[in-house]
Amino acid sequence: MKKQNLIDMEGVVTESLPNAMFRVCLDNGCEVLTHISGKIRRNYIRILPGDRVKVELTPYDLTKGRITYRLRAKSSNS
């Protein structure tokens, strides 16, 4: 169940840190320290630097967030 007061944003993973932490540069230019959500961890989804991701932020601390979705890379075949 999704919480009401979360802020959803998109960004690019710039750095992979220990303990499943990542540094993400959001589309508005802010750098955020994030961790991965339980569903991504449970399904063994790999997050690598350069991936586009969706991030949830709380209005209380805009410097930390949670990666909720890894966006698919656009294929160059079409």
Swiss-Prot record:
CDD domains in the record: S1_IF1 (cd04451)
Family matches, as Pfam families: eIF-1a (PF01176)
Record keywords, A-Z: Chloroplast, Initiation factor, Plastid, Protein biosynthesis, RNA-binding, rRNA-binding
GO cellular component, one term: cytosol
Domain of life: Eukaryota
Gene3D superfamilies: Nucleic acid-binding proteins (2.40.50.140)
Predominant subcellular localization, coarse grouping: plastid
Location of the S1-like domain: 1-72
Span of the signal peptide: none
Keyword Plastid carried by entry: yes
The UniProt record lists the keyword Iron: no
GO-annotated molecular function: ribosome binding; rRNA binding; translation initiation factor activity
UniProt-annotated location(s): Plastid, Chloroplast
Function: One of the essential components for the initiation of protein synthesis. Stabilizes the binding of IF-2 and IF-3 on the 30S subunit to which N-formylmethionyl-tRNA(fMet) subsequently binds. Helps modulate mRNA selection, yielding the 30S pre-initiation complex (PIC). Upon addition of the 50S ribosomal subunit IF-1, IF-2 and IF-3 are released leaving the mature 70S translation initiation complex.
UniProt xrefs under NCBIfam families: infA
Subunit structure: Component of the 30S ribosomal translation pre-initiation complex which assembles on the 30S ribosome in the order IF-2 and IF-3, IF-1 and N-formylmethionyl-tRNA(fMet); mRNA recruitment can occur at any time during PIC assembly.
Family: Belongs to the IF-1 family.
Name of the protein this chain belongs to: Translation initiation factor IF-1, chloroplastic
Organism: Physcomitrium patens
Encoding gene, per UniProt annotation: infA
